[in-house]
Amino acid sequence: MAKKARRPAKTRIEDVAKVAGVSLATVSRVATGSDRVSPALRGRVLKAASELNFELNGKGKAKIIAFILANRDVFNPFHAAVLVGAEAYCASRDCGLLFLSMHYGSNVPWQNLHLPAILERPSPIGAVILAGKNSQNLLDLFTDKGISFVVMGNNVVGNWRQEEYSALQFDDIEGAYDATRYLHSLGHCDIWYVGNCQMPWFERRYDGYCRAMREMGLPPLLNDFESEGEDLGYLATKSILKTGASVTAICAGDDMAARGVYKAIHEAGHLIPQDISVVGFNDTEAASLNPPLTSVRVFTEQIGRGMAALAFERISRPDLQPEVITIPTQLVRRESCRPLLHLETAPLEARVSAK
């Protein structure tokens, strides 16, 4: 039986770069119509593309941004709100927005990572918004492929070269600082922080909490659990209450953890805020908790619009210098906190038994 002829390998943008003797970024700039390429280099790229019968489809790239949610559930309320903001900006600029989800390990070499098929070159995608939980290896992969991207700076885990990338972030350190100062202004001194400091966002918020506690002359009280979401808050709070430690207020690292804090406090027979005041972070769960949760509001839709604006700008100018934008947060006060009377200085168990 005659062997079937092997199909020729598909030409990739890497082949164009190799034949032209230029970088992937240079080929990408030519493809997107950037004016930051010398005529000589542009000619070499176009000649190589013609020889390889490779279409540099710059037109299509100018109108589509990919929103990639990495290593997060697609129903995550925080990132869903960021997506809404990105959609609003893209609609205002007559730009398409494509939602993609991917999961990858932070320890996988970037050469072994696989992008969603539509991002393999040639692609109509002009730039990418990286939301969810990301790490340096994916940033290296996008850089190697010459794909312009903007990353949410708060959610990059591990060591990363922040100065090399365009990013939008919110000031979670200052947000946690404000929340802790607020609790102290109500008379609280036994203020615990609940979070998983293996994650950079929890660690930064702990830094803000610690700064406030030091300024007030109080020792930081940390219960650090390697968990996520509601389980994190629930297990950490159960542990605190089990020890009999004095606690009048808890700063939860995010609202999902705060939901677990509520559950543990209620199971132990205590009341919020009569026995323990609670503050969350992100302001995504307030309406579904009873009493409504005091939380640090992150302007998620503004973040989405800002990331989309940065990405849109880099479609036509992929060689722009990295830019980092920081958005402030806002403490939203609700019914989960109350002033602590100066006479209420006994440990929690003693206060409850005296009722």
Model-derived features with residue positions:
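N-terminal helix-turn-helix DNA-binding module of bacterial transcription factors
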Residues: 1-61, 354-355
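Alpha-helical recognition/docking segments in bacterial nutrient-uptake
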Residues: 1-8, 64-181, 241-242
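Flexible loop/turn connectors
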Residues: 6, 220-221, 236-355
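Residue-level detector of anion-binding/catalytic polar loops
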Residues: 23, 55, 91-96, 148, ...
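Alpha-helical structural signal in soluble globular domains
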Residues: 48, 85-89, 141, 204-216, ...
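Periplasmic-binding protein-like
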Residues: 67, 121-131, 190-195, 223-224, ...
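Hinge/beta->alpha junction and helix N-cap segments in small-molecule ligand-binding domains
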Residues: 70-81, 99-111, 154, 167-178, ...
